[in-house]
Amino acid sequence: MKKEAVMSWLRSHEQEQIEFLQQMIRIPSVTGNEGPIQEFMAKTLTEMGLAVDLFVPSLEELQKHPAYVAPAQPYEGRPDVVGTLKGAGGGRSLLFNGHIDVIPEGSLDNWQHDPWSADIADGKMYGRGTSDMKSGAAAMTMAIRAIQACGIRLKGDLIVEYVMDEELTGNGTLACVMKGYKADAGICCETSSMCVQPGSIGRIWFTINVKGKAAGIQKHREGVSGIDLGYLVCKAVEEYEALRMSKISHPLYPDILSSIPCAIGQFDSGT
């Protein structure tokens, strides 16, 4: 009966869920600017009666962990938000995790709707982060609201993590781990096809530096072009990816060629 009650509430409050997601989309949160959306999430959880922990990850502490990835931007003003719905006791705990940062919106010429408008057209919501992954973060929040509205008291604690800096490093989640947040089970609420995704490819960032030899335009053939060398590196990385895909696979994803990707994400040259 409890499950049916929750599902019934969610169906009858669909518009409320849509409007909540629109509120989230309309607060830009490109990686590096997570502060405003996190203040909104902390306020929302506080109003719902959860115990809320709003904290800025410590780079000094993160650097001590082997899973730490060097940040591209400072962390000041970029907090994590963790909410806890305390259980009655005697039950297992559950943790929901979702990131709140989004990738840059890019050129507005590529958008049919303003990326921060959350416009709805033809049954779809348009905006940066609707899929990746403010919809998942909104679902986490609305699940708790549904439980509360139905008067359900869980036995175990329900913890919800809204983390920063997922798009670049994943250090937001690492900071929650290092602060001691854990549960008997956890679900990352990234959007999916409603199928359990039990594995992740992980991430390694690396930098390749090549050194050329400067020369004026009149004598450029006497120099060494760093750009030409860079092209060779790009080709080598492409061949390396093909080699990896031919030799490495994951038992959970045997038919996905891109399960072991390797690619150049940024190319800089010149002085």
Task: Describe the residue ranges of each PLM region.
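Acidic/His- and Gly-rich active-site-bordering loop/insert found
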Residues: K2-M125, L154
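Short, solvent-exposed loop/turn segments at the edges of secondary structure
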Residues: R78, H113, I201-W205, L257
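Acidic-enriched catalytic cores of C-N bond-cleaving enzymes acting on peptides and small amides
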Residues: G199, I217-F267
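The feature captures the short pre-catalytic strand/loop hairpin that immediately precedes
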Residues: D119, T207-K213
